[in-house]
């Protein structure tokens, strides 16, 4: 059967018996010589473990950096006299890390994973060191952008490398460790960030600067381990053309769209700035599609990948769930800090159930996938669970008990664990080995784009609604005797001044730090306003994520192979 297929492909007709035999012998000889190479495409467990430590160290850098900086950014802004510019430090990092994700994927398919991963870690270390000694918010934004150039490759390349050295059936177990790293960083980030911010100085260096300096030793350790241990079997250097036009058009297309997603609430979604960003972004992305169609297999994102049903459907699931679940996820720490009155450090600890849920979901899905070779059920269960928990989060109010928040956070985490890992495995199993890097990076890119747009849109909805909800809550409190009593208490004079400033428009909800020390009775209408606005966002998130259930159900359930049947890595 194999011989007939080869011959039919080659369109050989009217061949003599001796030609068939000669060709058959050559095929058999080729197969016998290459059987050992195919079997050795993947590494043994004892070889994988040290590599895994290096990959996880690099991944931990990127994951920790996002949460630790989020905790410290207000203090950093105050110290650098640029609190109003703090968003740019985050936006710059987000833009560069997002636009470089697909570039790392494609370039690693051409030049190899190891040199690109080492390059990514090195850039991240340099960016971290520069950020630690920033003298203004403008310079910090530039240095954070450099950090993002490295961060864009850390997660994508780590997943792609696992795809190179681990057979499809076993990938879920190892990739589960990566999900655990992200979960752990979400807890450690606020705790470590809170510790450094709370120090006036350490070894003569301002406390918040250690938020970035701590990345340097971790990065150097990861660099050493990866440099010494990472070896991908059957490495072959192949000459490929680099898709420069595709890279430029993608970059020019994504930057304005990401920028308007972050700043649209401030500019106004129909402002001149926003419309300009829309126009440049859409035109550039249209050009990107044209260039990619011309470049064929050399494209950064080969359009033929979308002909694969699994890749297309998982990409859609990634965008939708990225928007819904990460947009909804952004509400949890805000709820705990604004409505619950928790400090950033305490809020990080209160999100521990979410982390445990992610780890539980990843471990369960990883073991079952490894045992059965089937993955489809988990994205389906995960999207259903995410939808259900987001819907149940609409029950949150200003007086919700923490145990209920913890339960729903845990279930939300389980849903995340069931979606994040299996979707990557599904795509890696669907594409040829030569497309492993670009396919993995594409899934990550679509999820990041969804998360960026979703988070920005949900926060915009939150702050667009909170004013009206708070006003309604204040009107309902006018007849409350306890509220009137607190209003007349001279000890609450500063809180009353803040409330009056809000009502007259002299203050906004951009700074809510004063709520932590304010009288609880007086600010209860504000807490109600935020809680009601957040539940509205949770409802929208549930509706958005529910759409992904259909695409998860339609995703093919291809069985994962024991040793892999793809061609050896050729990069």
Task: Enumerate the predicted regions with their spans.
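C-terminal membrane-cytosol helix-exit motif in multi-pass small-molecule transporters
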Residues: 217-235, 253-258, 282-294, 551-556
């Amino acid at each position: 059967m194999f011989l007939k297929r080869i011959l039919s492909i080659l369109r050989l007709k009217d061949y003599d018996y001796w030609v068939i035999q000669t060709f058959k012998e050559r095929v058999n000889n080729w197969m016998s010589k290459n059987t050992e190479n195919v079997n050795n495409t993947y590494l043994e467990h004892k070889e994988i473990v040290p590599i895994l430590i290096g990959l996880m160290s690099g991944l931990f850098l990127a994951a920790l950096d996002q949460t630790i900086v989020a905790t410290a950014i207000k203090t950093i802004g105050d110290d650098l006299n640029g609190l109003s510019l703090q968003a740019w430090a985050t936006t710059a990092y987000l833009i560069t890390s997002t636009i470089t994700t697909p570039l790392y994927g494609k370039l690693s398919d051409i030049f190899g994973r190891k040199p690109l991963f080492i390059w990514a870690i090195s850039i991240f270390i340099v960016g971290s060191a520069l950020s630690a000694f920033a003298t203004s918010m403008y310079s910090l934004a530039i240095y954070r952008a450099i950090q993002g150039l490295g961060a864009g490759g850390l997660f994508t390349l780590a997943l792609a490398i696992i795809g190179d050295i681990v057979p499809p059936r076993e990938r879920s177990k190892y990739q589960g460790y990566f999900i655990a790293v992200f979960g752990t960083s979400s807890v450690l980030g606020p705790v470590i960030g809170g510790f450094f911010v709370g120090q006036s100085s350490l070894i003569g260096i301002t406390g918040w600067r250690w938020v970035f300096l701590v990345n340097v030793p971790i990065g150097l350790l990861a660099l050493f381990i990866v440099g010494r241990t990472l070896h991908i079997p059957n490495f072959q250097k192949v000459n490929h053309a680099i898709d420069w036009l595709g890279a430029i058009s993608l970059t020019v297309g994504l930057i304005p769209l990401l920028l308007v997603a972050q700043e649209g609430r401030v500019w106004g979604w129909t402002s001149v700035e926003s419309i300009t960003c829309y126009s440049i972004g859409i035109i550039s992305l249209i050009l990107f599609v044209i260039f990619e169609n011309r470049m064929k297999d050399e494209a950064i994102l080969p359009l033929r990948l979308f002909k694969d049903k699994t890749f297309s459907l998982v990409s859609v699931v990634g965008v939708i769930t990225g928007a819904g679940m990460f947009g909804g996820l952004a509400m949890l720490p805000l709820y705990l800090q604004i409505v619950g009155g928790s400090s950033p450090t305490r809020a990080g600890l209160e999100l521990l159930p979410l982390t445990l849920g992610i780890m539980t979901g990843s471990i369960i899905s990883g073991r079952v996938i490894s045992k059965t070779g089937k993955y489809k059920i988990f994205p389906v269960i995960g999207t259903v669970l995410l939808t259900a928990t987001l819907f149940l989060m609409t029950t949150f109010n200003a007086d919700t008990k923490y145990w209920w928040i913890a339960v729903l956070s845990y279930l939300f985490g389980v849903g995340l664990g069931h979606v994040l890992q299996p979707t990557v495995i599904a795509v890696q199993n669907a594409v040829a080995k030569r497309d492993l890097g670009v396919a993995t990076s594409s899934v990550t890119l679509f999820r990041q784009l969804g998360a960026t747009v979703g988070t920005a849109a949900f926060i915009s909805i939150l702050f667009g609604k909170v004013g009206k909800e708070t006003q309604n809550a204040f009107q309902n409190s006018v007849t409350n005797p306890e509220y009137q009593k607190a209003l007349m208490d001279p000890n609450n004079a500063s809180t009353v001044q803040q409330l009056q400033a809000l009502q007259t428009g002299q203050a906004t909800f951009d700074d809510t730090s004063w709520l932590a020390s304010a009288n609880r009775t007086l600010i209860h209408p504000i807490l109600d306003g935020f809680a009601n606005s957040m539940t509205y966002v949770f409802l929208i998130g549930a509706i958005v994520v529910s759409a992904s259930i259909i695409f998860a159900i339609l995703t093919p359930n291809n069985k994962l192979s024991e040793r892999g049947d793809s061609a050896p890595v050729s990069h």
